[in-house]
A protein has these predicted regions:
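Acidic, metal-ligating active-site segments
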Residues: 1-5, 266
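Active-site beta-loop-alpha junctions of metal-dependent nucleic acid enzymes
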Residues: 5-27
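Mobile genetic element proteins and their domesticated derivatives, centered on retroelements
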Residues: 18, 22, 37-40, 52, ...
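Surface-exposed, charged/polar loop-rich segments
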Residues: 33-35, 48-159, 238, 242-245, ...
């Protein structure tokens, strides 16, 4: 639910101000009804989150997983040439060069109506000018280039391209040489292959759906899949060392270390699927959460904050022992079989009554999101309501309109029409009503990475 907007005119957006805004909302809904506060990873937001944690020990500040992954991709795909970052730049600078080449080609083709006309005659799809504010913008652009490979190559070997003289010959030749260079396309394929696991996690977490309990496993699997892609491309065994993988791995681990919280570990530990034989047998290295030392330490930290009373904490620890070991009613056949068959929240509703304290915590955590994507849609809603042409609206009036629009949109998601035909997922692309024609330029800053099936359909229809 969208609660309210805050007029920050003439306010200093420091940690105290942000903490006050968050505190006011917490008091409005009640501290006992708040599990976490999700923000981006900006230092001022982190500082505000720590203030909130100090005042409300049972509430966690959680950095947005999508923003964290986007920062990791930026560290990899746009490494800075600094003294402290010299090793990363040495291993990853080739990615930046490939991305820069793609950006140059895109600008060259889209920057002139004649070149754009030649391109559109060879491809039914349009080139996308991806906003840098969009998550994984470099990867999105390269994925689009991969789809357009045949059309781009046909364009530069066509008679129209060769006969068009009123242009920069050197730049046109560079574009032609690059697009016909198999080595360049192999680099594009390599970038997409090892970043694909990261991109997949971005798509799965960039949503308002409950996925906090999935984050720990997704990160773990993502890191392994990235390693597999790099080692496969380099043709080396797991026993050998890849310096490029070491750099990428260090970036991902560093981002996970900075963004993970005990709440992620507790939510993971309360997912019945991770105790099922089916899940454990998928990988010989997997162990149930109660046998993992890191998860155990973080879970105990979380319990100490959520249950400050020692007797209550002892009770919930006993309940967790029964749940994780399949005792005291959790060991009946239905409860064990349903671990892998049921949605985690449904499982706790059906089988969790024997552990009332743990059930209450589980139902809260299994309903939590892990990103701030929903807030970004509210920003686009406000931008639509308060624009250059409609700029005399009082703040309270604009807030009321955003409140009504945002909550009506959320309510519409529960209607059958939201999942059918012309109105299917109508709000995924945000609230922009600008033309998508004219120059073939598409600004997709507000296009979410969630609903992957719709994303493909939305882009391919342009």
């Amino acid at each position: 639910m969208f609660l309210k907007a805050v007029n920050c005119f003439n306010e200093v957006k420091d940690r105290e101000f942000i903490a006050k805004c968050i505190r006011d909302v917490i008091m409005e809904v009640g501290p006992s009804n708040v599990v976490q506060v999700v923000t981006n990873n900006a230092p001022v937001c982190k500082a505000a989150g720590l203030i909130i944690e100090a005042e409300f020990p049972s509430i966690y500040w959680t950095p947005c997983v999508v923003h964290t992954l986007n920062l990791a991709l930026k560290n990899i795909c746009a490494a800075k040439d600094t003294e402290k970052n010299s090793i990363v730049y040495k291993e990853c600078s080739w990615i930046t060069r490939v991305a820069d080449d793609a950006m140059f080609i895109k600008n060259f083709v889209m920057g002139h109506s004649m070149r754009l006309s030649i391109f559109t005659s060879f491809s039914p799809l349009k080139l996308l000018s991806v906003a840098s504010t969009r998550f994984a913008s470099t990867i999105v652009m390269l994925r689009r280039f991969k789809l357009l490979k045949t059309g781009l190559q046909q364009m530069v070997i066509s008679e129209q391209w060769s006969s068009y003289k009123d242009d920069d010959v050197q730049k046109a030749q560079f574009v032609k040489d690059t697009l016909l260079d198999d080595n360049w396309w192999e680099k594009v394929d390599y970038i997409l292959s090892f970043t694909n696991p990261i991109y997949d996690v971005l798509r799965r977490t960039d949503t308002e759906a409950a996925c906090l309990h999935l984050v720990y496993e997704m990160w773990d699997s993502m890191i392994e899949d990235v390693k597999k892609a790099i080692y496969t491309h380099e043709g080396i065994s797991n026993a050998e060392i890849s310096t490029f993988h070491q750099v990428v791995h260090a970036i991902l681990i560093d981002r996970w270390t900075k963004s993970s919280t005990p709440l992620h570990c507790l939510a993971h530990s309360l997912n019945p699927r991770y105790y099922s034989i089916e899940w454990l047998s998928e990988d010989p290295n997997r162990v149930p959460p109660h046998q993992d030392i890191e998860l155990t330490d973080e879970r105990e930290k979380c319990f100490r904050r959520v249950f400050p009373d020692a007797d209550e904490r002892r009770t919930v620890n006993i309940e967790f022992a029964n749940f994780s070991d399949g005792r005291e009613g959790f060991g009946n056949l239905d409860a064990i079989v349903d671990r892998d068959k049921m949605d985690p929240k449904t499982w706790w509703l059906v089988h969790g009554a024997r552990a009332p304290l743990l059930q209450k915590v589980a139902l809260k955590l299994l309903a939590q999101p892990c990103s701030s994507s929903c807030c970004e849609r509210n920003w686009s809603t406000y931008s639509f309501i308060h624009s250059l042409k409609r700029n005399k609206m009082a703040p309270h009036r604009a807030e009321a309109l955003v409140f009504v629009h945002s909550n009506l949109r959320l309510l519409s998601r529960n209607t059958p029409q939201y999942h059918q035909e012309e109105t299917k997922m109508w709000d995924v692309a945000g609230d922009e009503f600008g033309s998508l024609d004219d120059s073939g330029f598409l600004e997709v800053a507000n296009l979410s990475l969630d609903e992957p099936g719709l994303e493909a359909g939305f882009i391919n229809n342009i």
